[in-house]
Amino acid sequence: LQKNNTGNSSLEDMNSTNYTTSDYTNAIEKSRSSVVTVESDGSYYSGIIIAKEKETVHILTTTKATKNGSPNVVFDSGVRVSSTVIGDDGESGVALIQVTTNFEVKPFTILDTTALAQGANVVVMSGRNLTTGSAVVSGGIVSEPGVWRMNGTTTWLSSMLEMDTPITSIQEGGAVIDLNGSLVGVVASQPFQGNSRMEYAITANEIKLIYNALKTNGKVTRGALGVVVRDVSSMLAYEKSAQGINIDMKTGVYVQTVVEKKDAGDDLQVGDIITMIDGIEMTSYQDVLARMYMHSAGDTVNVSIIRGGESKQIGVVLQ
C-alpha cells in the first residue's frame, strides 16, 4: 500500500490496487470462446469447437450429452442453437455434433501432444453453467503425457494425459489447454483404469483421429495390438543400455507391457521394438496409434520387430 501525506494507508489507495493477469488468465481468455455448453435433459456438459466449414460448426463433446438424442449448444456469447449428432464413439466416450451458425466462431488451435512435457501446466475449462452463468476452470500439471490407459470394458488402450487437477461433471467433454491456449486434450468421461487420485483427458493427437473417423463414417473402428509402448526416441541412454537397445537408435517403439490376448496369432513380447506395421515405418507411438485407426478388431497385421537384437516379422491379430 502507498501512504498518503499523513503517513497512513488510505482506503482510496486500497481500492486502486491493480491486479495483474497471469499466464493462466491469458490462456483462459484466449480460449474461452472455443468452449461451449452442451445441454441435454437438464444436465450440462461441455464441448469444444474443433472445426468450422463455412456456416457448419463441428463440436466434440461427451457421449453422455448425446445418449438421449440431439442436445442444445450454448456458445459463450449466450447464443443457443440446436445440434445434429454426427456420430459417437463408445470406446473413448467422445461424440461429434454439428450446428449451423451465422456468426463468427473460433475453433481451437490443436497442439501436437508429443511435444507436451511431464510437469507442464495445463488448464481444464468447462462451458458455462446456464443457471449460474459461471464456468468451471481448474489448473494443474501433467503427471504423465501420452500415458496408455484402458477403459473398463474393452482392451483398447487410449493415449491419455494424466493430471493432478480436479474435474467436475460439467467439465466432461471440456478442453484441456496449455498456457498458450492451445488444445492438448479433451476431458474423458469413460472410467479409464489408473491412479484414482488423478484425472484423465484424451490427448489432442488421438482426438484428431477420433474426429476424422466420426466426421467421415459417423463411427470409429480401430484395432488394438494389446500392448503398451514407448517411443525409443524418448528413452535415455541408461534406459536403452539396460534393455539392450543400441544407444544410437532413434526410431521405433518399445513394448513395455503386454495385455492379455484373447485371439490367436503371434504374440508381441515385452522388450520387442516395433519398427514397421504393414510395411509402414513406425517412428513413434503416434504412428502406431494412427495405424490402428485404419484397422478393426480381428484384422491381422504384419509387424516387423527387433527381438533380442535380431529382426523378424510376425502376424498379429488385432483385438
Question: Which residues fall in each region the model found?
Answer:
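N-terminal, intrinsically disordered, polar/charged segments of Gram-positive cell-envelope systems
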Residues: 1-37, 44, 69-70, 150
